[in-house]
Structures are given as C-alpha cells and as structure tokens.
A protein has these predicted regions:
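Extracytoplasmic gate region of multi-pass secondary transporters
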Residues: 6-7, 208-258
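Extracellular/periplasmic helix-loop-helix junction of adjacent transmembrane segments
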Residues: 10-43, 90
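C-terminal ends and interior cores of transmembrane alpha-helices
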Residues: 19, 66-85, 283-302
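Central cavity-lining transmembrane alpha-helices of secondary-active solute carriers
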Residues: 31-50, 67-71, 252-265
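Cytoplasmic membrane-interface "Motif A"-like loop-to-helix N-cap segments
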Residues: 54-66, 271-283
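Hydrophobic core of transmembrane alpha-helices in multi-pass small-molecule transporters
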Residues: 78, 84-104, 303-322
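Glycine-rich segments within core transmembrane alpha-helices of 12-TM secondary carriers
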Residues: 102, 124-149, 172
Length: 324
C-alpha cells in the first residue's frame, strides 16, 4: 500500500513539492523521485536478504515494515515547498529512499518465506499470493483515492487531502508490524546451523548465466507490471485524455481481476511447469506491449480501455504468479 499510494496520489501532491514547474514537469519530477526509490531496491534486497539469512525471515519482514512506516510518516508531515523551500523535495527523496530499501528487502524475503512454507506440490499456487498481497495494496491505495475523490474537492485534495493516505499508511504499517511479530519462523531457517546462516552472494557468482537470466526476467517483468498497473492511471489521464475518476476506476477494476488471476496461474504452473509460462510471457510481452499502449493512447471509452489493460495483465500473470 505505502509504495503504491505515492503513484496513486502523484497527480495531487506534485505541485506541493515542484510548484515552480508546469503540470507535465511536476509529474515528471514526481515520477523521477518515484524512480529514485527503485535505485535503493537492489541494495534493500541485498541488505535485508543478508539480514534474513542471519536473523531470520520474521525479523527481516518486521524491519521492512518499520522502514516503510517511517517513509510514509515523513511524506505525510513534510511541509510543502512554499514553506521550507528546497528541503521539501529533499525530505521527499529521503522518504522514498527508505521505502525503496523496505520494498527491495520485502519482495525477496516474503517470497522466500512463502516458498519455504509451501509444499513442493503447491509451491506455485502458494508463491502466487505474494502478488495477491501486492495487488491488494494497490487496490487499497486506489480505494482510498476513490473515497477522497468522492468526498473532497480537487482544491482540498491538492492542498492537504493527499496527506491523508500517507498517514493511513503509517498507521497500517503499525498494524502490520504487530501481525508480523506473531508469525512463525520457517522450518528451513530454524534447522539451518548457525554457522551456515550467511548470504550466498559468492555462490550466485558461480552461475553467471543463470544469474543474468533471472535479472533479465525480473527487469522485464517489473517494467511490465509497473507500466500496466502503477503507471496506467497517469497514462490514461495524460495520454488518452481521461478524467482522473474514470482512470482510477478502470485501474481499480482491472487490478481486482488481476489479483484473482494470480492463484489460477500459480496452480497452472504447478501442473504444467514454470518455464512454459515464462516463455508465453516473454514472447507476448515483446510482441504486444507497444501495440497495446498505442491503442490505449486513443481509447475513448471505459470498456475498450478495460479490455486492453486486461489483455496485458493476463500476459503479465504468466510472470507475476510465479516470480516469487
């Protein structure tokens, strides 16, 4: 939720930090700050992954929530550029760096936790729930946006209303922290001798081809996922000329269907294998992405936009359901 709420509300808070630019430049600067968070994700994945190998999956998942909570709280309370000048975007960048560390570690650790908890026969089905929870976070962010759009004026949303979802995120993180403190450690970690509880970076370097293959699949999958989920709302507003409300609603409905598809594709991978799904994803992703985005840019009605987005998300499900 905390990671995605930034993108969902970017249309409203961008001028609070970059008010001296025009609307397009404000969004580009806001998107650049969003991208900065991604720079910290590999570091977060390495750092929290190493922490998880030494202290346990449960401890790493708890730490990732603390980092995310701190980032959300900073964004919720930081004064705008008009009050503290350049320090406003500086604090925003710092908050996103913390959230990038959190998300980078969260993905790998949560995937490890679920795969270690799963049985071999249902590993794909179980691992698919990583993206179910991710999409639930996106849906919650869009749900908060829809409620605020219905109950507040654009003036209030642009002025101060955009802070509400970040404050909500900080509170939800506290709840998540309490829940994670009560989860069980995985059996795989508990039976591992203390002398062997260390990272495996040196082992990865012994398999460069496999490492590069995984990096390529992850880069392509992540780019596609964020394009057709996180970025789609802004694409429909800025490129297709949709209203903010229509763009938000079609994004929410398509994400709901996308979430339901994850266990189905996870179960299919248990039956037919992961490799065929990855081949379908890579082939259709390369051939279909540009035509879909080109058609979406001129889509004028809700149903056309929805079915085009869903076509892309069905292809994405071949990857997301098993990427953990």
């Amino acid at each position: 939720y905390d990671w995605y709420v930034y993108s969902a509300f970017a249309l409203y808070f961008s001028k609070s930090f970059f008010f001296f630019f025009d609307t397009t430049a404000q969004l580009l600067n806001t998107a650049a700050v969003f991208a900065i968070g991604f720079l910290m994700r590999p570091i977060g994945g390495w750092w929290l992954g190493k922490y998880a190998d030494v202290r346990g999956r449960k401890a790493a998942l708890t730490l990732s929530v603390l980092l995310m909570c701190t980032g959300s709280l900073l964004i919720a309370v930081v004064p705008p550029y008009a009050v503290i000048g350049v320090w406003a975007p500086v604090v925003l960048v710092g908050a996103r760096l913390l959230q990038g560390l959190s998300v980078g570690g969260e993905y790998g650790t949560s995937a490890t936790y679920m795969s270690e908890m799963a049985t071999a026969k249902h590993r794909g089905f179980t691992a698919s729930f990583q993206y179910v929870t991710l999409i639930m976070g996106q849906l919650l962010a869009l749900g908060v946006l829809l409620v605020l759009q219905a109950t507040m004026s654009d003036t209030d949303l642009n002025g101060w209303g955009w802070r509400i979802p970040f404050a909500v995120g900080a509170v939800l993180a506290v709840v998540a922290l309490w829940l994670r403190r009560s989860i069980d450690e995985t059996h795989s970690f508990e039976v591992l001798p203390a002398s062997e509880r260390r990272g495996i970076a040196s082992e990865l370097l012994k398999h460069p081809r496999a490492l590069l293959t995984v990096l390529g699949l992850t880069a392509g999958g992540s780019l596609g996922f964020y394009t057709f989920t996180t970025y789609m709302q802004k694409f429909l507003v800025n490129s297709a000329g949709w209203s903010k409300a229509d763009a938000t609603s079609v994004s929410a409905v398509s994400l709901l269907v996308f979430m339901v598809l994850q266990p189905l594709f996870g179960a299919l991978s248990d039956r037919f294998g992961r490799r065929p799904q990855l081949i379908v994803f890579a082939t259709l992703g390369v051939l279909g992405t540009i035509p879909m985005l080109t058609r979406l840019a001129v889509a004028s009605d809700w149903m056309t936009g929805f079915w085009l987005i869903m076509a892309a998300l069905v292809v994405m499900s071949c990857y997301t359901a098993i990427s953990g």
